[in-house]
Amino acid sequence: MTIPVGEKKLRLAERMSRLGTESAFEVLVRARELEARGKEVIHLEIGEPDFPTAPHIIEAAAQALRDGWTHYGPPAGLPQLREAIAEDAGRRRAIRVDPAEVVVTPGGRPIMFFTILALVNQGDEVLYPNPGFPIYESMIRFVNGQAVPYALREDRDFDVDVEEVLGKLTDCTRLIILNSPHNPTGGVMSRASIAALAEALADRDIFVLSDEIYSRLIYEGEHVSITQFPGMKERTIILDGFSKTFAMTGWRLGYGIMRPDLAGQVARLMTNSNSCTASFTQIAGVAALRGDQSCVDQIREEFRRRRSVIVEGLNRIPGFHCPLPHGAFYVFPNIAGTKRSSRALADSLLNEAGVACLSGTAFGAWGEGFLRFSYANSVENIQKALERIEAWARRNL
């Protein structure tokens, strides 16, 4: 793979040709370019809570800086944060978590990457959801693994079809990636589906990466983790963090929970890459988990209100059908009635209506026929976006 640089060419490692990207940031760049030219754009493309971080968390970080928490820390994370995570995660999932099973990382993505680096050899198969978070496939391909998608379908409320997943297992299957609540659909895996999958995997040497970053943003029912079922905790890596729950995306604070011997290997990868996670942000993480939780409740209830507004609004627009998502802060409307491809419609809404959203195909080929909107924006802006989309649809459809 070569890239022109002046009169010379940069010769990159072949693996770089296998590295993907995340379309949300590409759309954000295009939207910013339109704004720079004077066009008003409503941003419903980025999955980032628009709330400020709670004051007690900010103050904990500020005090940590004043107290000198500005130096290297342990690669696996500060003991006090690992203890707080173990207590919180164990209580919320009704499982026992030891601090030795926790690795703290700068954001949740290193847990995805390090899990795949540590477990997947060339040619090993990894099952992942499609549509799904695009970085899953990117990381699988980067390490020369075989990316094997399983479908999430609207007629199943975007729950996992366990029979389909089991039908894709082979002797080469090393890892299954689950994501619930799910990005981009907002779907939530049912207890029955998780239980059936756990039972089927009981006698197989297969790990599960369970991406539970939205686990506290569920609007009906409760979060269920596959680690709650017999025999699964020791073969599951939980990915979680602070970005979505506590509106701390820019703090870069995530963690993984896994068996201690694997945690030691992931900590080695931290040593060889990031060294450690910033200490003062970890002190803030302790305050987030052990302090007042009303900020989380307020964020969830505001998202619930916005969800109602955007679902009702989209269902009034010709050509759109929007099911009610049960978690996260995304809607994934079916746009087959518009007779437009997902990419073409997303481009038109950005360029002509001034509404930034993502094509369903940004999350895999099986996202065709859908768009993803993030309702991590004010009700006022969501309503304005809906008015623009409806006006565009009535002019063009």
Regions found by a protein language model. Name each.
Residues 2-12, 20-22, 27, 33-40, ...:
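PLP-dependent class I/II
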Residues 16:
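Substrate/cofactor-recognition hotspot
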Residues 72-105:
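Conserved N-terminal alpha-helix of the aminotransferase class I/II PLP-enzyme fold
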